[in-house]
Regions:
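Intrinsically disordered, low-complexity, mixed-charge
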Residues: 2-156, 166-177, 181-260
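TRNA-recognition modules of translation machinery and tRNA-sensing kinases, especially anticodon-binding
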Residues: 162
Length: 260
């Protein structure tokens, strides 16, 4: 299918429904198979995502109930590196990131791949960044959208969600926005070119930590209502807001995994 169509489906799958607040909850498998539906990914894409779904099933069995997102990224990217020997690293990384994002955000792959209803379902785990589940969810959602749609759309979706949170949710959070933008950068680096895709795999293989892919969020304002946000930053085109974005981008640019 067209990359733009896939990007839209990924955005709908990951962003349309409020994310779970505790450990990832995987719904029980239906007892009666659903009526056949058209798979929206190609057979090759479906097979790749299935491989990483199975990888998650096995990996989480060895993880504690609450653990850093890195503990799942490492085995998935190791699998991607192995599979890339017979294919394109960009395709393998994209499928790995998509399967990861769907799992971490507690969604169902059936939105994208109806036949996945019969696939093994991984046990639930609470994946975190800086000990926060919401940052892991933001990071992986933006990584998947960035890997399929590119930075502008991923950044726009992340900003739209924060503005909506300011109006009626948990409040505008620059920490969440930092996770969004770091995730977008990760997704782009993993899928932009073959050299960058393989380089990322190699960096993760040689030793990996949260501090290499996710910036510190200390000092980034959070939980701002729409009124609070407007009083402090006036709007998303103000110098005050731009300075905050510049600070976030500075922190991301300094992360080791994104260095050339």
């Amino acid at each position: 299918m067209a990359r733009a169509d896939l990007a839209l489906l990924v955005a709908i799958c990951l962003a349309a429904v409020p994310a779970p607040t505790a450990a990832v909850r995987m719904a029980p498998r239906p007892q009666t198979p659903a009526a056949p539906q058209q798979t929206l990914l190609s057979k090759a894409e479906t097979a790749r995502v299935r491989a990483y779904n199975d990888g998650i099933v096995e990996a989480v069995k060895r993880l504690p109930q609450r653990v850093s997102l890195v503990a799942l990224i490492e085995p998935l990217m190791a699998l991607a590196e192995t599979r890339s020997a017979g294919g394109k690293a960009t395709d393998e990384n994209r499928a790995a990131i998509l399967a990861l994002a769907v799992y971490v955000n507690g969604r169902k792959l059936a939105v994208l791949i109806p036949e996945s209803r019969t696939w093994p379902r991984p046990e639930g785990r609470a994946l975190t960044l800086h000990s926060r589940g919401d940052l892991a969810q933001h990071f992986t959602m933006s990584a998947a959208i960035g890997a399929t749609a590119g930075a502008p759309i991923a950044d726009l979706i992340g900003l739209a969600k924060e503005l909506d949170d300011a109006r009626r949710g948990s409040g505008f959070s620059f920490a969440d926005l930092a996770a969004d933008r770091a995730g977008t950068t990760f997704g782009l680096r993993a899928t932009e070119t073959e050299p960058k895709a393989r380089g990322l795999q190699a960096k993760i293989e040689t030793g990996f930590a949260e501090s290499q892919m996710m910036p510190e969020v200390t000092g980034l304002p959070e939980n701002m209502s729409e009124v609070d946000f407007t009083q402090r930053y006036r709007g998303i085109r103000s110098p005050e807001y731009t300075r905050m974005l510049d600070e976030i981008e500075r922190r991301i640019a300094a992360l080791p995994i994104f260095q050339r």
